[in-house]
């Protein structure tokens, strides 16, 4: 089996309301690039990359000169053609490789009549739980709906998602308001959904590294009684101004 064509299409996924975070806002959509890898046997494998537009599509068109005629089973050779350990540091090559590798694995699964997990070593679980991903949100500028700013709005939104999809874990993206206000909202969320059998649902928080060490410690101590899965990136990575003795978790974990 040989690759005969590579196509890339930008896809925008609409958001029901703008999502707020420490870096600003996702205003109306998520952008992705869907990649199709076609072969001489008529099979088409699908992959995906974050981001998109003219530049992303042009990158995948350029990959045709490297990969047309290539056997999609030769994944390591493809990796060294596109993203060897030196070149992979530049121009998002690892993202491009990941989308193409995914498409090639899809092709191999189709050709061999097996699921991709068998190619990668076998399935370990029958089910994989998903968590709700909660954001503070602006109201949709067109409809005025979807705002999440208060603790009451956050809890109502989390309950809606739980009712619709059955989530038992809930991650809140912070770094938008003062840590004390976000603590109030997070505790309200845990108070509403954290009770019941087996201590109820679990919770996760991520302020995108905008807190000081002191703020992070204060927040962490204030939620020790919550069923936390993790506290993600409370401070900037490799915070040179922090005292290593302030943390009981090694900095190498990134937490």
Locations of regions flagged by a protein language model:
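Metal- or metallocofactor-binding catalytic centers and their adjacent structured scaffolds
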Residues: 6, 38-112
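Structured beta-strand/loop patches that form or line metal/cofactor-binding pockets in enzymes
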Residues: 1-46, 50
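N-terminal small/glycine-rich loop or linker at the start of catalytic domains
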Residues: 118-147, 185, 198-202
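Active-site mouth loops of central-metabolism enzymes
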Residues: 90, 129-155, 174-175, 207-212
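Short, charged beta->alpha transition segments
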Residues: 115-120, 154-161
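Catalytic domains of carbohydrate-active enzymes, especially glycoside hydrolases
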Residues: 157-173
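Catalytic core of soluble alpha/beta enzymes
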Residues: 174-255
């Amino acid at each position: 089996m040989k690759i005969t064509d590579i196509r890339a299409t930008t896809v925008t996924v609409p958001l029901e309301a703008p999502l707020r975070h420490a870096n600003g806002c996702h205003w109306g959509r998520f952008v992705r690039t869907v990649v199709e890898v076609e072969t001489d046997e008529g099979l088409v494998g699908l992959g995906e990359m974050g981001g998109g537009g003219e530049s992303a599509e042009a990158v995948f068109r350029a990959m045709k000169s490297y990969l047309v005629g290539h056997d999609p089973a030769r994944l390591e050779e493809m990796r060294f053609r596109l993203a060897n350990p030196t070149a992979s540091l530049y121009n998002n090559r690892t993202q491009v490789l990941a989308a193409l590798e995914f498409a090639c694995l899809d092709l191999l699964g189709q050709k061999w009549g097996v699921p991709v997990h068998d190619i990668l070593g076998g399935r370990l679980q029958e089910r994989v739980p998903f968590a709700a991903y909660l954001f503070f949100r602006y109201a949709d500028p067109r409809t005025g709906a979807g705002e999440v700013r208060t603790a009451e709005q956050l809890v109502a939104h989390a309950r809606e998602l739980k009712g619709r999809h059955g989530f038992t874990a809930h991650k809140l993206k912070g770094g938008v308001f003062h840590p004390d206000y976000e603590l109030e909202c997070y505790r309200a969320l845990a108070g509403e959904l954290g009770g019941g059998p087996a201590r109820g649902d679990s919770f996760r928080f991520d302020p995108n590294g905008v807190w000081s060490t002191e703020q992070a410690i204060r927040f962490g101590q204030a939620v020790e009684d919550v069923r936390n899965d993790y506290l993600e990136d409370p401070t900037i990575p490799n915070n040179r101004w922090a005292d290593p003795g302030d943390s009981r978790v090694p900095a190498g974990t990134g937490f």
